[in-house]
UniProtKB/Swiss-Prot annotation:
Molecular function in Gene Ontology: FMN binding; pyridoxamine phosphate oxidase activity
Higher taxonomy: Bacteria, Pseudomonadati, Pseudomonadota, Gammaproteobacteria, Enterobacterales
Record protein name field: Pyridoxine/pyridoxamine 5'-phosphate oxidase
Cofactors that this protein relies on: FMN
Protein purpose: Catalyzes the oxidation of either pyridoxine 5'-phosphate (PNP) or pyridoxamine 5'-phosphate (PMP) into pyridoxal 5'-phosphate (PLP).
């Protein structure tokens, strides 16, 4: 228990000076602006620019978050892959509502997608799984994600065992490994601004079009 914490986080602050976001900077389709920002994040050599915070909820309404890598995006949605026995996959099976947050701190930016997740087809999953490095494929077999284990050595021993087993030939797709596509209907773009007057624009699906509103910071 920390009673007298000398590490005071209340005074940790900085100014956001990397520019603003104006309506004439926006695109008609939010995915076009997202792609532009993502490319800028890559050009800025941010660590893991495709990393997103994935939020789901359990049957009691308790939210959970974790970092997952985006693997594809287009007008159909945003795609990520995971162990189907994982907490997030189980929660999405019960409640498909999901939030994705891209935290590009070094650029004073963030993007939030809201929508529903749907399972990818076996063909889509197999196609991506085949493109992964072999060690990553084996890693998918090793971990029963979110289950309790006694020590890291359990994972390492299993990895070496399976690496020997799959030394020759291809690594098959685990039946418990798959992916999700997030069909989004809301996207918010946030750009840090001076004096905490941040710029926020919310895209909301309106039939085949997108309604755009500026939000107060």
């Amino acid at each position: 228990m920390i009673e007298n914490n000398e590490f005071d986080v209340a005074d940790l602050r900085r100014e956001y000076t990397r520019g603003g976001l104006r309506r004439n900077d926006l695109t008609t389709n939010p995915l076009e602006l997202f792609e532009h920002w993502l490319k800028q994040a890559c050009d800025a050599r941010l660590a893991d620019p495709t990393a997103m915070c994935v939020a789901t909820v359990d049957e009691n309404g308790q939210p959970y978050q974790r970092i997952v890598l985006l693997k594809h995006f287009d007008d159909k949605g945003l795609v990520f892959y995971t162990n189907l026995g994982s907490r997030k996959a189980q929660q999405l099976a019960n409640n498909p509502h999901i939030s994705l947050l891209f935290p590009w701190h070094m650029l004073d930016r963030q993007v939030i997608f809201l929508g529903k997740a749907e399972r990818l087809s076996t063909f889509e999953v197999m196609k991506y799984f085949a493109s992964r490095p072999k060690d990553s494929q084996i890693g998918a077999w090793v971990s029963q994600q979110s289950s309790r284990i006694s020590a890291r050595g359990v994972l390492e021993s299993k990895f070496l065992e399976l690496k020997q087993k799959f030394q020759q030939g291809e690594v098959p797709l685990p039946s418990f490994w798959g992916g999700f596509r997030v069909n989004f209907d809301s996207v918010e773009f946030w750009q840090g601004g001076a004096n905490r007057l941040h710029d926020r624009f919310l895209y909301q699906r309106d039939g085949n079009d997108w309604k755009i509103d500026r939000l107060a910071p």
